[in-house]
């Protein structure tokens, strides 16, 4: 396969490398992800993360394994293993469905390579389209609040919600971005703050619990988040804490927008209750670890509830910004997401 580079993925010498997102921002470190076991380990540890990026990394790995001599049967097993690595992220399932179709073509090796590269290019185009559509909703002088990380680190392109923010900033319409730290793994404080700094976008970092105070003081004009899965009724699964922000935004009369590509839609999932929610390791809540070392602050035997995602009901969402344009609540109520052709 040709040499390839995105913000978080690299292909060189027919090997896949991922940017270690657990080491950022202190260290920019590339890790080998050239086996199924390695990539699944990176996904579980969130060294590679973001629904679009997970699907793209899995697709690239399958193509590289095919080029490196794996049989069709071996690739089928690898595909199923990768599919199970992150159950909430529907982009992974959608991408692997396309790779599975390529796998069963007669000349499956070039078919897999072509499909993986096509997915990368499509994601870049989807991100650009989302940014253009969403930036039309950002008014001059806006102070925006965002959650988790939805930029180039999570996609092959400019990102989803963060791509909208960057595009709107380039148009002169963003005065400030409130970045909530996004407990427990601090994707906002570590990754979004880093990306905004690289882009020159003015931001202020806050703890998650400060959002309500800012909204009450009139300091937030809109909330922008991404999505890991959008159900047929418009319910959205996203990083834990998204639902809290949606409730707060609704109470304070603040627009709450979800930015995602069509690959995040799941027309076969009727509502948020049907979305599987991953439960993660208690140690993510009882302490923190990074390139600086590890610290534990909770009692040794503390019982922990640690879902990776929550579900935001469609009734709390002002608009779903897709690569095809902005979808308003009225269209969702009429069933627009029940068909994959939005």
From Swiss-Prot:
Pathway participation: Amino-acid biosynthesis; L-methionine biosynthesis via salvage pathway; L-methionine from S-methyl-5-thio-alpha-D-ribose 1-phosphate: step 1/6
Highest taxon listed in the record's lineage: Bacteria
InterPro entries: IF-2B-related, IF-M1Pi, IF_2B-like_C, Initiation_fac_2B_a/b/d, M1Pi_N, NagB/RpiA_transferase-like
Enzyme Commission number(s) of this protein: 5.3.1.23
Alphabetic keyword roster: Amino-acid biosynthesis, Isomerase, Methionine biosynthesis
UniProt-listed Pfam families: IF-2B
GO molecular-function term, one example from the UniProt record: S-methyl-5-thioribose-1-phosphate isomerase activity
Top EC category: isomerase
The protein's name in its UniProt record: Methylthioribose-1-phosphate isomerase
Species of the source: Enterobacter sp. (strain 638)
């Amino acid at each position: 396969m040709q040499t390839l580079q995105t913000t978080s993925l690299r292909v060189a010498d027919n090997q896949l490398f991922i940017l270690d997102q657990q080491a950022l921002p202190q260290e920019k470190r590339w890790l080998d992800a050239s086996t199924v076991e390695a990539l699944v380990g990176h996904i579980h540890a969130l060294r590679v993360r973001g629904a679009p990026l997970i699907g793209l990394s899995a697709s690239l790995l399958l193509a590289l394994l095919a080029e490196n001599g794996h049989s069709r049967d071996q690739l089928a097993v690898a595909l199923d293993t990768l599919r199970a690595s992150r159950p909430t992220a529907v982009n992974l399932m959608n991408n692997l469905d396309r790779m599975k179709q390529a796998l069963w073509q007669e000349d499956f090796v070039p078919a897999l390579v072509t499909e993986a590269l096509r997915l990368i290019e499509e994601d870049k185009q989807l991100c650009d389209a989302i940014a253009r559509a969403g930036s039309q909703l950002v008014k001059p002088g806006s102070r925006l609040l965002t959650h988790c990380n939805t930029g180039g680190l999570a996609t092959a392109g400019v990102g989803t919600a963060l791509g909208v923010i960057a595009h709107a900033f380039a148009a002169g319409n963003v005065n400030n971005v409130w970045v909530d730290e996004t407990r427990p793994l601090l994707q906002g404080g570590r990754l979004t703050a880093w990306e905004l700094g690289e882009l020159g976008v003015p931001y202020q970092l806050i703890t998650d619990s400060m959002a309500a105070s800012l909204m009450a003081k009139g300091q937030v004009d809109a909330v922008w988040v991404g999505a890991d899965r959008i159900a047929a009724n418009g319910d959205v699964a996203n990083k834990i804490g998204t639902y809290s922000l949606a409730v707060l935004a609704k109470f304070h009369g603040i627009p709450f927008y979800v930015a995602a590509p069509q690959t995040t839609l799941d027309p076969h999932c009727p509502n948020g209750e049907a979305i599987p929610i991953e439960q993660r390791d208690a140690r993510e809540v009882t302490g923190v670890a990074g390139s600086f070392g590890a610290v534990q602050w909770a009692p040794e035997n503390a019982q922990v509830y640690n879902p990776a995602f929550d579900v935001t009901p469609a009734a709390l969402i002002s608009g779903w910004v897709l690569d095809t344009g902005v979808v308003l609540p009225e269209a969702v109520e009429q069933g627009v997401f029940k068909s994959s052709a939005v």
